Regions:
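ABC-family P-loop ATPase nucleotide-binding domains
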Residues: 78-136
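The feature captures the beta-strand-to-loop junction immediately N-terminal to the Walker
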Residues: 33-35
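Conserved ABC transporter NBD signature motif
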Residues: 56-67, 71-72
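ABC transporter nucleotide-binding domain
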Residues: 165-244
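Helix-to-loop junction immediately C-terminal to a conserved catalytic motif
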Residues: 48
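Conserved structural motif at the start of ABC-family nucleotide-binding domains
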Residues: 2, 17-19, 73
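Catalytic Walker B motif of ABC-type/P-loop ATPase nucleotide-binding domains
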Residues: 149-153
Length: 297
């Protein structure tokens, strides 16, 4: 389990997070959403230990992320949006170099995924398109046998068939021990894949809830007139899509783009209906926190 407690983080004097708390249990594919610049990538880097909190803790099964112990590192993989790849290397050489650090790497899985994604494992990266390179890295990431997989904009550069393949592969490969976090602004690409959903904004967590809980609290009405009580309305073919508080308990089809806009425009209402996590009292900094604070200044 990934646990984030009382997390503060800033780049010099620019605050990114202020006392946020999140828990990512295993067995789920989480959607991490937010406008550009709110800290989605920063949060992924904090989770895998590439950044240190100013205050608070980030742990994976009790191991402190920024300590980057080998026991933790072999259980987590982070795929950034862009990766600098050696022109003359190949996907097979790439995983050969990673193999010693990941004892659960499965060569057969890698080759199967490369075949499914229609990329040749021995083709040089310089001969590939950006999308082919991205598919190679996705195949590699899912072959390392880690419990935790962090994706930053994984569908960037993928064509429509490849996006469908990505969704299919991820849904099939999710196991009870896995936690997958997808940070993206292309929500349509992962709309039927992610559950729960986390939305970040202005140093805080605006929403942290399962799809079922969102549907209990909000109703998505399709094809009607624009409603004055709507948290968000959007004209679509056949009428308006309205997002309104769910007063009847009736279930509706979630639209993540509409949800995102409704949350950003109605922060207080989203908090009142119980979709925003309650902030916990900030604990006094420990000696480790103070040392971390110094290293970030």
């Amino acid at each position: 389990m990934i646990e984030i407690r009382n997390l503060d983080f800033s780049y010099k004097k620019s605050p990114v997070f202020n006392n946020i708390n999140l828990t990512f249990p295993q067995g789920c594919i989480y959607g991490l959403l937010g406008e550009n610049g709110v800290g989605k990538t920063t949060l992924l880097k904090l989770i895998c230990g590439l950044l240190r909190p100013v205050h608070g803790t980030v742990t994976l099964d009790g191991l402190t992320a920024h300590d980057r112990q080998p026991e933790m590192l072999q259980r987590i993989v982070f795929l950034p949006d862009e990766v600098s790849l050696p022109d003359n290397s190949t996907p097979q050489r790439y995983v050969d170099e990673l193999m010693p650090f990941y004892p659960n790497f499965a060569q057969g899985t890698f080759l199967h995924l490369m075949q499914e994604l229609e990329v040749e494992p021995d083709r040089k990266f310089k001969e590939m398109s950006f999308g082919q390179q991205k598919k190679s890295l996705i195949a590699a990431s899912l072959s390392l046998g880690t419990d935790y997989v962090l994706f930053d904009e994984p569908t960037n550069g993928l064509d429509i068939p490849s996006k469908a393949q990505f969704r299919s592969i991820l849904s099939r490969r999710l196991e009870e021990r896995n936690t997958i976090i997808i940070s993206t602004h292309q929500v349509k690409d992962v709309e039927n894949l992610i559950d729960p959903i986390v939305i970040l904004n202005s140093n805080a967590v605006l929403l942290d809830a399962s799809v079922q809980r969102i549907q209990q609290k909000l109703f998505f009405e399709y094809g009607g007139e624009q409603r004055p009580d709507a948290l968000y309305s959007e004209m679509q073919p056949g009428g308006f899509l309205n997002v309104v508080p769910n007063q009847t308990g009736e279930e509706s089809q979630l639209n993540i783009e509409a949800l995102f806009n409704a949350v950003l425009r109605n922060k207080n209402i989203i908090r009142e209906i119980g979709l925003t996590p309650n902030p916990s009292p900030k604990e006094k900094g420990t000696a480790a926190d103070n040392e971390t604070n110094k290293s970030n200044q």
